[in-house]
Amino acid sequence: MAKRDYYEVLGVGKNASDDEIKKAYRKLAMKYHPDRNPDSKEAEDKFKEAKEAYEMLSDAEKKAAYDQYGHAGVDPNMAGGFGAGGAGFGGGFAEAFGDIFGDIFGQAQGQGGRRGGGPQMYRGADLRYSMEITLEQAAHGYDTQIRVPHWDECDHCHGKGAEPGSSVETCPTCHGAGQVRVSQGFFTMQQTCPKCHGSGKYIPKPCTKCHGQGKLKSQKTLEVKIPAGIDEGMRIRSSGNGEPGINGGPPGDLYVEIHIKQHAVFERDGDDLHCQMPISFATAAIGGDIEVPTLGGRASFTVPEGTQAGKTFRLRGKGIKGVRSGYAGDLYVHINIETPVKLTEHQKDLLKQFDKSVHEGGSRHSPQEQSWLDKVKNFFSS
């Protein structure tokens, strides 16, 4: 099958800059990399095609030959061809991605590893700890302790991983390098040694207590300081308290993820608080002083006369002091007018008399009701 034009493969024009060619290749390689598409032959073919195109167009000499003669100028089976070569991940692939690709697909670059001979070092995995706290603790701050998984040196083999009296040998597969070269088609790549898993060592007789790991799992107590104003989903990082590194690599970090319990009175919206405040019909009509709950205690508030159901009042600075802004939010009080229940006959008579007197006053006492009645009349008369 005829090869596609290299510029077409990468989706760039013939006047594309080196940077544009590199960006286009990175995008395609990320999309079709075998680690992301383990069972897709089509993705594997597209990955190889993009890699070949990049290797040609990123090399000035090969690019010039391709621009002048097309595939004939670079095909090793044709006279004068340069050939795709066998650069593998050490050539165009590594050049284009550096440690970015290593972070995604677990290569040593960018993870505390080192290139060249010898076992590869890997950064330990990060740990996540989910912690649930109250709204009050989130608002005011909170010091606590947590217990997290921890690894201690095995007291039987003293961290060697081998049964006492036995030795640790150089891995016969990778000869201590920690990696092996694997050929795939026209290029090769390095992979972690399947026998020693990157350590470069082989333990014929593993420790019977730690099973060759050289460490034992335990629990560790950590002090955690929850800052005032922390919000739902925020994370606190504890550096170096994640999983231990491999082959001398640095440990990962511990992330404490905060979840806030539902509160009986308040709902939080960022640094603001909302609460529903039931008041009596009489207080809504003639006004009065009420006590409003806040996280700092009770606050007095005067309800103006004629307050309608659903009215919202804002109490400035009665919310939560933001962990980032440093300023306190506001408290929004939503008024709910409570309808009295289980009335006595005397109370019912009084309300009927009151209702009659209100209606005799016309729209002066019930402007919203009168406005609604006018709209209804207009609807039926139209």
Curated annotation (Swiss-Prot):
CXXCXGXG motif repeats lie at residues 154-161, 171-178, 193-200, 207-214. Residues 5-70 form the J domain. The keyword Repeat applies. GO terms for molecular function: ATP binding; heat shock protein binding; unfolded protein binding; zinc ion binding. CDD domains: DnaJ (cd06257), DnaJ_C (cd10747). Zn(2+) 1 binds at residues 154, 157, 207, 210. It is found in: Cytoplasm. GO terms for biological process: chaperone cofactor-dependent protein refolding; DNA replication; protein refolding; response to heat. Its main location: cytoplasm. Zn(2+) 2 binds at residues 171, 174, 193, 196. Its cofactor is Zn(2+). The J domain is necessary and sufficient to stimulate DnaK ATPase activity. Zinc center 1 plays an important role in the autonomous, DnaK-independent chaperone activity of DnaJ. Zinc center 2 is essential for interaction with DnaK and for DnaJ activity. HAMAP family: DnaJ (MF_01152). PANTHER family: CHAPERONE PROTEIN DNAJ, DNAJ HOMOLOG 1, MITOCHONDRIAL-RELATED. Homodimer. Participates actively in the response to hyperosmotic and heat shock by preventing the aggregation of stress-denatured proteins and by disaggregating proteins, also in an autonomous, DnaK-independent fashion. Unfolded proteins bind initially to DnaJ; upon interaction with the DnaJ-bound protein, DnaK hydrolyzes its bound ATP, resulting in the formation of a stable complex. GrpE releases ADP from DnaK; ATP binding to DnaK triggers the release of the substrate protein, thus completing the reaction cycle. This is Chaperone protein DnaJ. It comes from Ralstonia pickettii (strain 12J). The lineage of its organism: Bacteria, Pseudomonadati, Pseudomonadota, Betaproteobacteria, Burkholderiales.
